[in-house]
Amino acid sequence: MGGRLIDLGVRGAILAATMSAAVAAGQTHKEFRFNVGPKAGVSVNNPYGSISVKPSTGNVVLVNAVLFSDRVEIDNNVAGNRVELESHLLAGADAQSGRVDYEILVPADTSLSLHSSSGVLRAEKLHADVSLEGSGATVEVRDINNAHIHVKTLNGPVTITNVQDGHVEVDSLSGNVTLNSVTGPLVQVISTSGGINYLGDFGDHGDYRLTSHSGNIEAIVPDSTSADVSARSVRGEVHDDIPLQPKQHTSFVLKQGSAFWGTMGRAAVSSTVVLRTFNGKIHLRKRSAK
């Protein structure tokens, strides 16, 4: 009996390895190279699969793509200083057979437009405008400075990390949004039911607007933060763990437990922070000392 079980186990392992090899055999690797000038543009439309973009050296765009079957092709076009890539689905393609995973290297000053319905959209270490859009895609942006960042998702989570001097706009239906060390003249998040988490100091002289209809909003800030903060939840609760200098004149009634408005830090350099939700909770608290 024991020998038979071992034999079945060996057969199972061989079958799994065979199936894995068959899947891998159905994949195709393609590489593209495009020479571009300064401040080029790259757009990628990929219905199924991930897109990852990092900086390259020199004025060249390098594309490494993995196609998961022969039911999808890659169309490419160069128009002036702009490179356009599109995953072209053939008859019978579905989310698995039509999948393409892209790894792309671009000059750091290249503007991006990335679209995928699923997978991961990732852009990092650039200093140019970035637009990322996907229904269920996971969006990750990090280490981007002096740029406009536009993100639009339905239910995919969004994480933006270490962005300085950015114009950041995030529009999400139900995905959770996390901003970690994100500052700039404009930082705006609008969500219908997703939660919003901000970790950072709100910078200097910026305009920060975090709004969710039914999701919770949490802002965790250090002692050095200077900000004029107003928070209001129509049907939910608000909590403030940081002493604020109350505003003398406000545009709405400050009902205990559902709204607050005050200044923390140095008013002369403070950013304007607006936190709004209809029936979610809002929590402003101090970052724990490590």
Please give the residue ranges for each predicted region.
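Intrinsically disordered, low-complexity terminal regions
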Residues: 1-290
